[in-house]
A protein has these predicted regions:
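Residue-level signal for alpha-helical context at structural boundaries
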Residues: 45, 52, 59, 71, ...
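Membrane-proximal alpha-helical anchors
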Residues: 1-76
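Structured, soluble extracytoplasmic/luminal domains of envelope-associated proteins
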Residues: 85-125
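General structural signal for secondary-structure boundaries
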Residues: 7, 77-78, 126, 140
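Eukaryote-biased recognition of C-terminal alpha-helical segments
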Residues: 111-155
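Structural motif
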Residues: 75-88
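Short leucine-rich amphipathic alpha-helices used at interfaces
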Residues: 3-5, 89-90, 146
């Protein structure tokens, strides 16, 4: 009888070990799926942040100010500068979100490269450089360093 109990106990241990392995595989798959879902949600949030800035161009006066800012942001009136600064704050906040999301590993490199290239074009324009000189203190230290390094290589 004791031998039979030992055999049952051994079988129970083997079944228990198999159950633990299956549970760990399930947890691993679930974590991977959750990570993918978070990455997709982050990308969707960034798209929403960026699309919100297109409403600015429904205002013909702002669109005209934007065109002026491409060549020389210093030519903008005080009102235009305030509008343009608010617009770029929205754009740069979206860029910072993308940057921090990518740095934390929650955005794939190929997605980041597309967004980063899009926003770099703004920074390299006269208006983008003007805004960064005026508004950079409103951003995280890591993001400030990143943008400063971009400007250092393009000037």
């Amino acid at each position: 009888m004791t031998r039979r109990l030992k055999e049952y106990a051994l079988a129970a241990e083997i079944i228990g070990a198999i159950a633990v392995v299956i549970s760990l595989i399930y947890v691993g798959v679930s974590v991977n799926q959750n990570t993918n879902a978070v990455m997709v949600a982050n990308h969707q949030a960034l798209v929403a942040l960026d699309q919100a800035t297109t409403d600015w161009f429904k205002d013909p006066d702002f669109a005209a100010a934007y065109i002026i800012s491409l060549d020389d942001a210093g030519k903008l009136s005080a009102v235009q500068q305030a509008q343009f600064s608010s617009y770029l704050a929205d754009k740069f906040n979206a860029w910072e979100f993308a940057f921090l999301t990518h740095e934390s590993g929650m955005m794939e490199d190929n997605i980041w490269q597309g967004w980063d290239g899009h926003y770099r074009m703004l920074l390299q324009q006269s208006g983008g450089r003007w805004f960064w000189g005026e508004g950079r203190e409103g951003f995280s230290p890591a993001f400030k360093s990143y943008l400063d390094s971009i400007l250092a290589t393009t000037e």
